[in-house]
Amino acid sequence: MAPPVSVSEVQVESYLFPPTITPPASTKSFLLGGAGVRGLEIGGNFVKFTAIGIYLDETAIPWLAGKWKGKTAEELADSVDFFADIITGPFEKFTQVTLILPLTGQQYSGKVSENCTAQWKAAGVYTPADGKAIEKFLQVFEPQSFSPGDSILFMHSPESLTISFGKAGDIPETSNAVIENKKLSEAVIESVIGEKGVSPAAKKSLATRIAHVLNHF
């Protein structure tokens, strides 16, 4: 199926996110929703760690249009509900996290799993099945080490999270693991574009681009 409207590529630092992508172990083409840098202020300097691209299954566009068509980019960017609809919507999402600085798998997965577990426990929804999903998540990342230009790839399906690793800008044909856990699938993308998401730049890009797509749909 052709995209309802054309979307453009996005350059983040020296990394280019193409307008469409086919994730590992998939035959479907996903549209680039938005992309941006993740960084932190350290000692008065903004240190950039990763470039993050958020891709959406094309079925997301008509689904989102019912509620959000006609809204401005600013309205979407300021709406917690808009990003929640992307996170929890009944369509697949694909997140590409490309390293700007080197990182070990344990450093990455440790922080993500710590945040997920704390969030679930605070909400009173943590279960033994979630604990097993986190264990598997940590195991998948444990032997990994990432250099600048390498990518961590997540396919967010409604009931599962598929994890892949790409080296030097390549998108692999196969995935490394599938974790059957709805909450983990949503939590990983929420960590990027949720209310406390780590990449305000990716959120702004997503709101701007999706507003344009919906208003031409």
From Swiss-Prot:
Q: Which reaction does it catalyse?
A: a chalcone = a flavanone
* Entry keywords, A to Z: Flavonoid biosynthesis, Isomerase
Where substrate binds, per the record, is at: T50, N115, S191
Task: Give the InterPro entries listed for this entry.
Answer: CFI, Chalcone_isomerase, Chalcone_isomerase_3-sand, Chalcone_isomerase_bundle_sf, Chalcone_isomerase_sf
What pathway does the annotation place this protein in? Secondary metabolite biosynthesis; flavonoid biosynthesis
Protein family: Belongs to the chalcone isomerase family.
What is the protein's given name?
A: Chalcone--flavanone isomerase
Q: What is the protein's species of origin?
A: Eustoma exaltatum subsp. russellianum
